[in-house]
């Protein structure tokens, strides 16, 4: 392998919105990242439903133009 062309591989600290923290190795340029869900709080792994408000494009469209289609 060539010397000096590969990104630095270092420890990154991840913090979830539930408070869970863990470290992993990555070539990511940041020292810390924030996660919305992790293995401790994701509904698939916990079996509990949790509402995650992401406010997607469809919601924005319905908010802007939802009243137009209802007039009949």
UniProtKB/Swiss-Prot annotation:
**Source organism of this protein record:** Aliivibrio salmonicida (strain LFI1238) (Vibrio salmonicida (strain LFI1238))
> Looking at the record's lineage, which domain of life comes first?
Bacteria
Look up the record and name the cofactor or cofactors this protein needs.
Answer: Zn(2+)
Binding positions for Zn(2+)? 16, 18, 38, 41
State the function annotated in the UniProt record: Binds the 23S rRNA.
Q: Which GO terms describe its biological process?
A: translation
* Name under which the protein is recorded: Large ribosomal subunit protein bL31
GO cellular component terms, A-Z: ribonucleoprotein complex; ribosome
Q: Which PANTHER family match?
A: 50S RIBOSOMAL PROTEIN L31, CHLOROPLASTIC (PTHR33280), LARGE RIBOSOMAL SUBUNIT PROTEIN BL31A (PTHR33280:SF6)
The text of the family note is:
Belongs to the bacterial ribosomal protein bL31 family. Type A subfamily.
* Subunit comment: Part of the 50S ribosomal subunit.
Q: What is a GO molecular function of this protein?
A: structural constituent of ribosome
Q: What are the protein's UniProt keywords?
A: Metal-binding, Ribonucleoprotein, Ribosomal protein, RNA-binding, rRNA-binding, Zinc
Q: How is the cofactor bound?
A: Binds 1 zinc ion per subunit.
Q: Name one Pfam family in it.
A: Ribosomal_L31
